[in-house]
């Protein structure tokens, strides 16, 4: 698929890039997709599922507005997700932490998603999400060290944790049992110490589409 999104979290510059929309599952036990990573439904009880998972978070290049700041390498994450399915709604809560790359700390991710099938081929989903990032995670993403400050002219900045909330919707047309076309749109809002970072307040935008 094709993705049009900010070139880094907090940016006001958008870029278009190719984005794979793979969605693979092995019955109700294993799953893999770009949004949720690779997971194993270790516990399945009624409408509840508990799954350990691994995934990936992208990094940030040090070019254009950020050319005098340090580059941030993306990395792998590991976490645990609990999900509850009730009628057309799917609720989930996950805790995840990196084990490679330049970002330390952890995140707590809460999601709710409404799903509806309009016909044999058309599907839609819509739902809110809330992500809390720890002090270390936020500092690695939005902080500015004394060295970076001297190079860039931005004020030194050492943030604490922050929350990001948003809304995401999708529309899917099924071509066959294996292939489909999906359009996804969303908006999110950075708050607190992330919103106040010079990377966002001076050269970026707290509202992300």
Specify the residue positions occupied by each region the protein language model found.
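Residue-level signature of outer-membrane beta-barrel architecture
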Residues: 2, 24-26, 42, 82-86, ...
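Outer-membrane beta-barrel transmembrane domain signature
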Residues: 39-41, 101-204
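Membrane-embedded beta-strand positions of outer-membrane beta-barrel proteins
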Residues: 22, 34, 50-54, 82, ...
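Transmembrane beta-strand segments that form the barrel wall of outer-membrane beta-barrel proteins
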Residues: 1-6, 30-38, 62-67, 90-99
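Repeated loop/turn-to-beta-strand initiation elements of outer-membrane beta-barrel proteins
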Residues: 28-32, 48, 88-92, 121-124, ...
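Short glycine/proline- and aromatic-enriched beta-strand/turn motifs that initiate or cap beta-hairpins
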Residues: 1-33
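Outer-membrane beta-barrel pore domains and translocons
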Residues: 1-5, 37, 53-57, 94-98, ...
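Residues that define the transmembrane beta-barrel architecture of outer-membrane proteins
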Residues: 14-20, 46, 72-78, 104-108, ...
